[in-house]
Amino acid sequence: MKVGVIMGGISSEREISLKSGKSIVDSINKNKYEVVSIVIDEKEDIINKVKGIDFALLALHGQFGEDGTVQSVLQTLGIPYSGCGPLSSSMCMDKDISKCILKAANIRTAPWINLRKNDAINYEEIEKMGYPVVVKPTHGGSSVATFIIKEEKDIKDAVIEGFKWDSEVIIEKFIKGDEITCPVFGDKMLPVVAIKPKAEFFDFTAKYADGGSDEFVTELPKKLHEEVEKMALATYKALKCEVYSRVDMIVTEDKVPYILEVNTLPGMTPNSLIPKSAAGVNISFPELIDMIIDESMKVIR
């Protein structure tokens, strides 16, 4: 089977995508697959460069790669691909839509408001939520242009910065607590990974700089683990995820978990969060890649 590892793209997360793609190419079982690297530099490449492959292994992140666009093109071309379909990908990429769905499904997520470019900032609503709040692009990733705002006077500048990256900006209540991530594979949750950023929160530097954070498989107290697992699986189902996704949460001091967001194409280097989680149940990185391909091939699109 000829597998095209698709990486690069046109989003702000291009460099991270190239790292994920290279790691997959380096680690995939070459005895089992014929592997080609496909670097996307412009949108047309997703049509022009995929000819002749039997399967697209997606290592794209951010807009155009993680928002359902590429998935729709591949589906139209009849090329099987890894991970979630177009609908789930687009819903998870849009933090406003995904939070609306979670709220409707009675899955706990922080209060928020969403702004489009011509909307007035509703300071009264923000005051009701209570400071601090998080301001970030609605369709952004890797915590790019994400700010923790503690006073009303700083809101406007953060919103202006957010609009440099996106057509919509989300303002949500900052939940103080410990961040965890819960990889879901099929209908099962893999081991929980704790994230201990050395900065105030898990920002771009903490995510990608060496030593920016400590990340490790953790064992939660039984009752909390059960609630986290129930929420992760319910979130995966509500947002119609397929094959695998990463559900990020924050757990307060009182052991109350909140859903932060869902990543449908999370980082895939050996040191990324999903491979770390898989290693906790003795699944190697090459084995994880195999599992993703096998499960993706079973999905009827």
From Swiss-Prot:
Reactions catalysed according to its record: 2 D-alanine + ATP = D-alanyl-D-alanine + ADP + phosphate + H(+)
Domain ATP-grasp span(s) in chain numbering: 99-294
Sequence positions that bind Mg(2+) 2: 261, 263
Cofactors named for this entry: Mg(2+); Mn(2+)
GO biological process, one term: peptidoglycan biosynthetic process
PROSITE patterns: ATP_GRASP, DALA_DALA_LIGASE_1, DALA_DALA_LIGASE_2
One Pfam match: Dala_Dala_lig_N
Cell wall biogenesis/degradation in keyword set: yes
Keywords, sorted A to Z: ATP-binding, Cell shape, Cell wall biogenesis/degradation, Cytoplasm, Ligase, Magnesium, Manganese, Metal-binding, Nucleotide-binding, Peptidoglycan synthesis
Major localization class: cytoplasm
Highest taxon of source: Bacteria
Family the UniProt entry places it in: Belongs to the D-alanine--D-alanine ligase family.
Function: Cell wall formation.
Name of the featured protein: D-alanine--D-alanine ligase
